[in-house]
C-alpha cells in the first residue's frame, strides 16, 4: 500500500498509480474523465493522457525545440512567440459540423490529444501518441450484444447508466445538473434521485 499525504487527492492517486503500474496500466484502471501530464524522473520522459470519451482536453504544440502543453489553448497562446494562424481546414469543419476533429484545432501548429490516447514525449523531442481505448464493436467489452433481446439490452443500459451516475455522485462538494429539456438530462436526474434515495435539488 501507499501512505497518502492528503485525505482525498485525485492527483495523489495518479502519482501512486503511475509509480505502481506505469502509465499504460494506470489509464486502463481509471474510470471517469481525466487529462493529465506526468514527468517520469527515472525514465526522463513526459506522459500526457486523455480520458476515453475526451471530456477533459489537453492541447500541445512545439516551437523552437520546446514542447508546450495545457488544458486550454489560451494558456499556450500566452507565449507571444506562438503563431496565431487560423487552421482553415479546421474552421471549415467547425462551421459545418460544430466540431474540430482531433488532433487539429482552430490554430495551425496547436493540436489536441485525441480521446482515449496517451502520448510519450522523450527528451530529444520525439512524441508518440497511441490509443489505449476503442469503442468500436469487437474492440470493446461493452459491444457484445449479439443474441440479446430488447428487455436485456434496456436493462443493461439502465444498469450501466445507474452505475456511472452513482460513481459520479461521490463528491465532497455540492452536485448540480444542467437540464437541457431533453430526455437524456431528465433521465439522469431521475436516476440520480433513485441512487441518492432522496429528491435531487
What is each model feature region?
Residues 1-201:
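Cysteine-centered catalytic environments shared across enzyme families
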